[in-house]
Swiss-Prot record:
The keyword Cytoplasm applies. This is NADH dehydrogenase (ubiquinone) complex I, assembly factor 6 homolog. The keyword Mitochondrion applies. It is found in: Mitochondrion inner membrane; Cytoplasm, Cytosol. The lineage of its organism: Eukaryota, Metazoa, Ecdysozoa, Arthropoda, Hexapoda. GO terms for cellular component: cytoplasm; cytosol; mitochondrial inner membrane; mitochondrion.
Amino acid sequence: MRRLVRNWNCRLLFNAKSGQEIVSHAGIHQEAKTNAIPREKKVIEADKNGYGAKHCMSLVEKYDYENYLCTLLLPRELRRAAFALRAFNVEVSRSVSGHQIEPQIAKMRLKFWHDSIDKCFEPDSQRSYVEDQPVLRELKHTVGSRKLNKVYLRRLVTARERPPTHAFESIRELEEYTEQTFSSLLLLLLEVGGVRDLNADHAASHLGKAQGIATLLRSIPLAGRQQAPCIPLEVLVLHGVSQERIIRSKSDDKGVEDCIFDVASAANTHLKLARQLHDKVPPQVRKIFLSAVATDAYLERLRRANFLLTHKSCVGRDTLLPARLFWKSLLNRF
């Protein structure tokens, strides 16, 4: 293990360093600071100092830690753009989550993100508030340097228009939601890698659904009654279980166990379908799918806990995940 820790990427994973060292490793050039910065040059100087990139990395590290680890292991030339996209996704998600957010306020926030996407695709000659927001500034830089599909970015926002208290009717509806959110982000990362491949797109679609369903399952004990559990109504009716029983998730409730099993099985099916396409996915972008490692690890812990969402092994961080990710990265597998 000590030999592995000498590797730059591995040190980043296990030490979770930030600031100058990580930003430099991410391929972002740093300039010496000046004592006096003219007002009109603050944005330019901030970009030179990598503030926007550091801000994006910090956001992802704080709110999306597993994907933060996965992004650290991407090729250097993809890392900055990947952090920008993941930070944008974090910001959109945070804008509609939390305690007692009024629907009208959530709608206004999403409208802001919709407008911001359009601003990021405007020519550099048209200045706007994008330059003053670090995440949007990084997103605009990514849009300007990569050929990104605006449709995928819009999906990340449009999907969040769904009220958090609105339950899914069926597993298919749940899969459509996760494809809009998680799969769209993976497809954007493929575009950052410059890959146009049908098999890679199919793998991204299946993996996004698997990761999304697993993430929504993990959120049930944390969200409580703030949002409807992700268990579809058709599954609840099949096993005669109420949403309240899902939220409580008692260890001796067989009906709840069966409901969680059905939904987790859907995630596992998509994960297997994604991995079946492994050899057909171009080798240079396989690391984009490292999130499959974290998804697989969670589903396995959930299985061993008899699908009890509140089991201690299912609510805490996976301390072995950095080692698993690094090993899969060395093998270039997901």
